[in-house]
Amino acid sequence: MDISIISDRNNPLLQRREIKFTVSFDAATPSIKDVKMKLVAVLNANKQVLVVDTLDQIFGKLEAEGYAKIYNDEKAMATIETKSVLEKNKIEEEAEAEVAEE
């Protein structure tokens, strides 16, 4: 899975960075959690304040376009983001421990 950043914009009014990106992959479309962890590594960001808002498959290609936001702090994120977006970006600690062991 390869991620390329299309745009990276700072939005001081909402206390966040807004990132548009494309994801190239070989098989099925990766999950939001997989894309989030890859973005954390590529952007050197804190996983607690990074939110993948959308991930849309490009018809006929093994690519997807996405939109992510990196907030300055968790308080700003909780104030602005909806509960559904926060739930789909939630990462359980047990899952991370399993990945770290492998």
UniProtKB/Swiss-Prot annotation:
<dbReference type="GO" id="GO:0003735">
    <property type="term" value="F:structural constituent of ribosome"/>
</dbReference>
<dbReference type="GO" id="GO:0006412">
    <property type="term" value="P:translation"/>
</dbReference>
<comment type="similarity">
    <text>Belongs to the eukaryotic ribosomal protein eS24 family.</text>
</comment>
<dbReference type="GO" id="GO:1990904">
    <property type="term" value="C:ribonucleoprotein complex"/>
</dbReference>
<keyword id="KW-0687">Ribonucleoprotein</keyword>
<dbReference type="InterPro" id="IPR001976">
    <property type="entry name" value="Ribosomal_eS24"/>
</dbReference>
<dbReference type="InterPro" id="IPR012678">
    <property type="entry name" value="Ribosomal_uL23/eL15/eS24_sf"/>
</dbReference>
<dbReference type="Pfam" id="PF01282">
    <property type="entry name" value="Ribosomal_S24e"/>
</dbReference>
<dbReference type="InterPro" id="IPR018098">
    <property type="entry name" value="Ribosomal_eS24_CS"/>
</dbReference>
<dbReference type="InterPro" id="IPR012677">
    <property type="entry name" value="Nucleotide-bd_a/b_plait_sf"/>
</dbReference>
<keyword id="KW-0689">Ribosomal protein</keyword>
<protein>
    <recommendedName>
        <fullName>Small ribosomal subunit protein eS24</fullName>
    </recommendedName>
</protein>
<dbReference type="GO" id="GO:0005840">
    <property type="term" value="C:ribosome"/>
</dbReference>
